[in-house]
Amino acid sequence: INVLKNTDGLAYLSFISDHGTAIYDDGKSLYGGNTKGNYNIAHFFWFNDLYHKQHPELIQKLSINKDKKITSECFVDTSLELSFIESKIKKGCSLLNDKFIEKQRLVKNGKVYDFDQDL
């Protein structure tokens, strides 16, 4: 982040984890187990001062959706929009959409589970 702070021009950093980790969540410590802790993933954005100054509306839109249930598929669409890249491959899952609609979150561990109902 310190490198990006000193970058001329717009800069942002986005991170998404490929998996979560259950460390005594619900009294369990399981690697690869079928628990919410193993499926909850870290996802964050950081913006430099110039990005905040020139595009506060985009950061506000992210803030509006910060507590919504999302999946990792939202990462690509959101990153394309934050980078001002036009693409025909968007899936309609950008966190910059102020009318963002939560989708059913499914996980697979031998069989398909509804994250919010079954785990």
Give each language-model segment a name:
Residues 1-119:
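Catalytic domains that recognize anionic headgroups
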